[in-house]
Amino acid sequence: MDILVLDLETTVERIEGRIDNSPKNPRNKCVSGYWGWLGDDTVDHVKKAVWYHKDYNGCDPTDELRADLLSADMMLCHNTKFDAEWLLEMGFTLPPLVFDTMIVEYLLAKGQRRPLSLKESAIRRKVKSLKKSELIDDMFREGIDFSEMPLDVVNEYAEADVKACGELYLAQLPILEREHNQSLKKVIPFMHEMLLFLCEIEMNGVKVDLDVLEEVEHQFQAEKDILEKRLNEIVESVMGDRPINLNSGADMTRVIYSRELISREAHQQTFNIGTNEAGKSLRPPYMSSSQFIDAVRVTTRIVHKTTAIQCPDCSGKGSTQKFKVKTQIKRGKKYRVQTDEPYKNRTKCKTCVGIGAIYQSTGVAAGLRMSPSSPYDASINGFKTDKETIKGLILQAERKKNDVAVEFLTKISRLNALSTYLDSFVAGIQRGTRNSGFLHANFNQCVASTGRLSSGGGMSINLQNQPKRGFPVRKCFISRFENGTWIESDYSGLEFRTACELSRDSQGLADILEGKDIHRQTASIVEQKPADQVTKDERQRAKAQTFLPLFGGTGNGQPAHIKAYFDKFYGIYEGIHGWHQSLMTGTLKNGTVETPSGRQYFWPNVERTKNGRVTRATQILNYPVQGFSADLVQLACIRAFRLFKQANLRSKLTLTVHDSICVDTHPDEIEQVKSILTEAMTGVGEEAEERFGYKLVVPLDIEISGGPNWLEQQEYA
């Protein structure tokens, strides 16, 4: 096999503190290219072409690189997607196969966090041609890109990278041949095929209607303003005159839990708050309920309502006026005497610290009087007020019939969501949409430990974190074709089906074959109403509860009817419960879990805890389901890409989000696209058997919908 090792150097643009090195930015340029044929132990000769550099007059021809790419059997890079997209944008044709040494390093990490740069990977594999260049790193930090660096430094650096990449590949081959790594050889080919699919959708991009996005922004902002006004009214009623910042963790602890820290240091020590040398969060200590209550009382104190009175020292102005002094001599002695001439600037009042008021305690307990449930709720500012914690606190407030707390917590949860929507999605899409009107997402194969795709980085936004249905921002994603249709095909209940598949749960399989709506069943229990009265929104909300038992959730701390759901789930789906026990026992023995697709996860220091579970239990039970689900979705993407090329369609594959594939569909190709997506996604079982030697027993079902944009969708029959 003729393997061409390649590395491209490009310019980058820094926009609002973000690095944009996308080939879709018309201001970015490919500075130079370096490539060579892989020999027995390295790349013996590295060729180069310079196309855009301040010290280089002219532009080298591309003929030799074009010919080498056409004659190569495989192109080898580190972070191949980046180089591949630049080559495609420049009009080159890729070889039949691509290979990414970063993907292999990611797979060899087996779910553990480790640096994946070429430099770190080469050090790890003891590559001889690695050239560490502090000069290059320093110039990057100073905002100097490759077109402005000394050309001889760039050439030396890039040529060494080409050789290091080739040698890294050669070092990886024998590691993959080791017995305990054999299964990874099944994953590697389809991850590289998936890489080409990602190149396709990223280069295609999605058409954005910025006017619609602006309307959504105004709607979000108007709702946010109303929420903030009402939340501040509630705060004033439960806290008195004390000023509260809704974005402050310490202030939210005061409002929600009615407590504040006595000593931050003592609080951190008591609840083991912080990180270890590896940067991982420390594990909270085990405490009985009474011990936890005592610890809360020792490290925090009750907050009282306050009344504001005018500061007597500054008359409520928050500052005092000082006057200049002059020196006088009287009877031979010097005296400093205040004059009537004031200083230009007033001085902050020390008594009220510039506020203009002094807050006096009324002796009445303030806040919503919620209770933290365990040491896991402790945080550096007092107690947690994150999204998941607030969900639990809402249930607690409902049990206590604390209507004010329910309203506040529900509204603060929505306010936080709106802030995320405005900052991450609306602003992110506005920033990332090119002058062409297209947003080009960036998908990452080597970030999520599970094997799931992530998105983001550079000018891209995290599409994986958006709400799945009914999210108004989706309305701005439209078709590039006149009268075109945005089609989305989504796997139905994939994670539940995957859990039933991996556990071979007989009841789960029977429910799937009978078409039982698991999420509706869950919603019926959670909402405490008959299944036929469950609304679509209630069913969607209940999905989170359905998935929790799949990943080892116990329902502890939940209301009795929800806790009963967890117990009932494990009683009904005994196969899943037994599989969970098997996973934990197996991980205790050898530290590794493997999926049918060959993906592996490694936990080296797992141990059994006092309550009978094992450490890392959530990951041990979650990763196999997430990983195999991800691999099934990626196989579907590969199949869709293959079928699209065969059909030579004008329609464009645009996104894969969660368990779905999105297509910007030409008006003349709707039926073809629906047919291709159905074949690609429901036929994944055949592909899995061919690639992995594994036969699926659980059928996969999809829902296909279409409409003028990503929000307004009608399900096809």
Predicted regions and their residues:
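Conserved "right-hand" nucleotidyltransferase catalytic core of DNA-directed polymerases
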Residues: 1-18, 25-27, 32-35, 44, ...
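Active-site-proximal helix-loop-helix substrate-binding element of RNase H-like nuclease domains
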Residues: 25-28, 35, 39-178, 275, ...
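Short active-site loop/helix that positions an aromatic residue
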Residues: 81-92, 105-109, 253-261, 492-507, ...
